[in-house]
Amino acid sequence: MSAAARTFISIHIGVCFDEMDSPGSSAPSPPDLTIIPKISSKKCQICENPAHGKHFGAVTCRACAAFFRRFGISNNFKPCKTENKCSFRKNGYFSCKKCRMQRCLQFGMTIDNFQFDREPFNPLKMNVGIPQTVDTFSGRPSLILFSAPSGSSGPKRYIDVQFLVDRAVEVLLNGSETPYQVSNVLQKLAIGLQNIRGPQQKVSQIVTKIGKEGIFKLWEEEMLRMAKWLTYFDDFQRLPHSVQIEILNGVWFLFGRLENIASTALARKRKLCKDDMVMTCVNKNVLICDLRTLEIDLSWCSKYTFQQLKFFDQYDDLRQLDILINAMLDLEPTHEELSYMICQLCFHQVGKKLQGNILKTVEKLQEVLSNNLHDYYVNQMNQPKYSKRIARMMKINNTVEQCLYRDRVKADLMKVFEVFHVECSHPGIFLNA
């Protein structure tokens, strides 16, 4: 290129730049050509990858910094498989966390700059204060916190019931009042049940309040009726006398519970009592009461009232009792069926409780009664398909057993908190009464 041409090009370029710099020009400004410093060529002291900066006292990459931030406090790793002689880099992956942490510490990484408790909500700093209430002050929950009368604590009263046991033994020794010639044991038990259930044609007394004397009369009546009923059981009479007493002591309250349910159902059917009342018999006298309004005096055995003791059991016992009575009304068991239900319930419970020879004995008695019940359905009732009826009978018994279990749990709870201040000469007899 000639000198004249170069001069022309230079002049032309200068004119163009002057036009671009003029205020009226709309052309864009030239780009910023500031020189950017070259990225640092330092490597991570831990893994020798390109470093990001200084983290926790060492020049590291972001990955190693995050690793140390995560595991710098716990330092809880599995032992090294190569005795702390791992190669630190294998295709970009550290195979041993323990050796990686040791390398971090060797190059001076520390936890001094770690930041903790940066969350706006810190439960550790909250002042959790339990309000000072009567429950927290006394150390007892409101469920069992009662206002017992002052001066109620003292020596326990002793109740001797040996006379009751002696009377039951005497009844068993005397046997049944009248010998009966029947085809099987179940029929004889049905006859005995009719004899001991007492009159059910009219009401003798309506009970509104009951105390120590009335409670012991009920217990005595139920225990003696059970003993008298067992005298109609020939196979039971052949057992050793000690075994008879042991079985009687363990089941008399179950007999009273199931028999009273059946008696109440029969009384409601005959309109002898209202639908919200229950019935029982004491000394051939029919007694009825409304459990919702019945006053029970427990001052002779406890420093708490009956209403206060209801806090030990939130289950609606009265509703459960109505369910059982209605189920018995729908079933309308015959005396043979009711006798079998009572025996099955009593023998099952006493066998489960006493085990050993008693369990084997009651299982044999149940087998005899089961065969008699089969003969009763097939030969007398002409009902060979009776499985549904058996299922309804066992459903009632199972419900009674569930109530019995709840009573035992409640009794254990009352024992822990020393609700009753009495001692009985035979505590096992009245455990679930």
Swiss-Prot record:
CDD domains for the chain: NR_DBD_HNF4A
Location (main, coarse): nucleus
Compartments (UniProt record): Nucleus
Known DNA-binding region: 41-116
Keyword terms of this UniProt record: DNA-binding, Metal-binding, Nucleus, Receptor, Transcription, Transcription regulation, Zinc, Zinc-finger
Secretion signal, residue range per the UniProt entry: none
Coiled coil: none
Pfam family membership, one: Hormone_recep
Zn finger residue spans: NR C4-type: 44-64, 80-104
GO terms, molecular function: DNA-binding transcription factor activity; RNA polymerase II cis-regulatory region sequence-specific DNA binding; zinc ion binding
Keyword match Metal-binding: yes
Gene Ontology CC: nucleus
Domain NR LBD: 177-433
Family: Belongs to the nuclear hormone receptor family.
Functional summary from the UniProt entry: Orphan nuclear receptor.
Name of the protein in question: Nuclear hormone receptor family member nhr-98
Record organism: Caenorhabditis elegans
Gene: nhr-98
